[in-house]
Structures are given as C-alpha cells and as structure tokens.
C-alpha cells in the first residue's frame, strides 16, 4: 500500500476490506442465484422487480419515470426491459392523458399470471439463499445497516 500523505486516499483497513469484499461477493452470488431461480419462469430479476412493483401499484400501473426511480433502472434500461416484457405480453405502455410525453407501464393479465406463478419460487429462493442464513436479530441489524446506507443515497439525490 502506498505511503499516506495529505492527498493520498484513505485506504481501507483489513476489517473494512473484509467487510466490503464479503458484501460484494455475497451480493453478486445472491443476485445470480435469484436470477437463476427465476429462469424456470422465463423471468430475470429486473423483470420480476418490475412486475412486483406494478403488482403493488394502484390499478397495476405506474408512470415510467416513477418505475425507473423505484427500480433504480436508468430510463433507457427500463425502456429496454419494457420492450422485452411487452413482447412477452406481461406489460404494456399507455400514454398519459395529462402529459403528452409521459407513459404508464401497465401490468397485463398475463403479467399478473407470471408474477403469481413465480412469486412462491422467488420467496423460497430468497429464504434459502438469504433469510435462512441469518438469525432474526441479524436480520434486524442488517435491515438497519442497509436502511442507513439507502438513506444516504436518498440524501445525495435530494441535495444533488
């Protein structure tokens, strides 16, 4: 590691590095496993997340801009996913009557059937790859940690 000076980066300590690397590796494995477990339903994790958000929304519809924000997808990435999902018949886009440039993402009955079919397997996957490895106390601590980190990003967006 380079010598420390006023302009040198503050390198991670061994404990910090272990925590960081463990998080990165575990999260990549977790997302890959969840994605693989959805393959039997012809869904990807982003598809599932989009359908899950739409299934919870009033009338199973959200403005595209709101859906992009909720799912943390760029507008272009969401647009690409929507094209794939429209082709599969899970969603459709509808023009927003109050905003000529705006569109709604709307879940179709086929999309509803897809998420209803996939949800039990997805929950089982989340349990086996994540929840079952943590005690209730660890789940509470982890939720607190990631809520704090998530909040720091929200503050950056508001301030930025």
For the regions a protein language model found, what residue spans apply to each?
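N-terminal leader segment of winged-helix/HTH proteins
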Residues: 1-41, 140
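C-terminal regulatory/oligomerization modules of transcriptional regulators
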Residues: 1-14, 136-160
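Charged, amphipathic alpha-helical coiled-coil/dimerization segments
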Residues: 5-7, 83-144
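Pre-recognition alpha-helix immediately N-terminal to the DNA-recognition helix
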Residues: 18, 22, 49-53, 113
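Short, locally clustered residues in the helix-turn-helix/winged-helix DNA-binding domain
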Residues: 24, 52-59, 119, 147
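N-terminal helix-turn-helix DNA-binding core of bacterial DNA-binding proteins
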Residues: 28-76, 158-160
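Short, hydrophobic-biased segments on the C-terminal half of alpha helices
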Residues: 64, 82-83
């Amino acid at each position: 590691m380079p010598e420390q000076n006023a302009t040198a980066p503050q390198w991670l300590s061994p404990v910090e590095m272990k925590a960081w690397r463990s998080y990165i590796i575990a999260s990549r494995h977790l997302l890959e496993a969840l994605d693989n477990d959805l393959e039997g339903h012809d869904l990807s994790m982003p598809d599932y997340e989009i359908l899950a958000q739409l299934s919870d929304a009033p009338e199973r519809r959200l403005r595209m801009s709101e859906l992009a924000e909720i799912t943390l997808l760029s507008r272009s990435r969401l647009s690409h996913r929507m094209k794939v999902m429209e082709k599969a018949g899970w969603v459709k886009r509808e023009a927003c009557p109050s905003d000529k440039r705006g569109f709604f993402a709307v879940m179709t009955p086929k999309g509803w059937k897809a998420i209803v079919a996939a949800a039990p397997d997805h929950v089982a996957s989340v349990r086996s790859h994540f929840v079952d490895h943590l005690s209730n106390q660890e789940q509470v601590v982890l939720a607190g940690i990631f809520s704090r980190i998530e909040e720091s990003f929200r503050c950056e967006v508001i301030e930025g």
